[in-house]
């Protein structure tokens, strides 16, 4: 509340807030759990990389990892071998992520449109990373039906 008073929410109230882009904590059995998948940009922005907390975390991790892994290559002369090693390194990491079920895809290519002659002469190299972390399972729907025809089969009639 505005005055700082804590409020206990049930699942329905947490879901209502989550539909407005507000993640909450709710009590589940004896523990508190984060309830909600969306970042504060939702529902205005529905781009999965911005809207889902787990996807945003993956993108942040991928970016930080790329920067840290390649920091030592800055200020070194670029050549075909170094360029390919950057791409190969990311793609090997991506293959591991995909084979471990962390994401559906993860690959890097040199951005041929941005790697113009002027950019290359200036020492600016551009890459494009395609990655698809799995979105959260927000809702599960299950329809049940009484199948009376099974009685005939079960009773051998």
Model-derived segments and spans:
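Long, contiguous, structured domain-core segments that constitute the functional module of a protein
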Residues: 1-86, 132-157
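Structural beta-strand/beta-sheet cores of well-ordered domains, especially the beta-sheet scaffolds
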Residues: 5, 13, 104-106, 125-127
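Residue-level detector of functional hotspots within protein domains
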Residues: 18, 48, 94, 111-117
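Generic structural hydrophobic/aromatic packing signal, biased to beta-strands
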Residues: 62, 108-110, 127-129
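Short, hydrophobic/π-rich interface segment
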Residues: 84-106
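Short alpha-helical interface elements
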Residues: 87-91, 95, 115, 119, ...
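Long, charged, glycine-rich C-terminal linkers/tails
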Residues: 101-123
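Long, well-structured alpha-helical subdomains associated
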Residues: 119-136
């Amino acid at each position: 509340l505005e005055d700082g008073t804590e409020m206990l929410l049930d699942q329905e109230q947490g879901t209502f807030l989550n539909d407005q882009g507000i993640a909450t904590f709710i009590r589940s059995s004896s523990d508190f759990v984060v309830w909600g998948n969306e970042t504060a940009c939702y529902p205005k922005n529905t781009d999965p990389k911005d809207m889902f907390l787990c996807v945003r975390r993956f993108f942040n991790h991928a970016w930080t990892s790329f920067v840290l892994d390649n920091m030592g290559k800055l200020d070194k002369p670029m050549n075909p071998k170094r360029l390919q090693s950057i791409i190969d390194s990311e793609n090997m990491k991506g293959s591991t992520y995909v084979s471990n079920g962390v994401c559906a895809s993860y690959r890097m290519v040199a951005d041929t449109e941005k790697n113009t002659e002027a950019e290359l002469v200036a020492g600016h190299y551009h890459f494009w990373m395609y990655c698809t972390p799995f979105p959260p399972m927000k809702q599960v729907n299950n329809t049940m039906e009484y199948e009376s025809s099974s009685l005939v089969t079960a009773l051998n009639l």
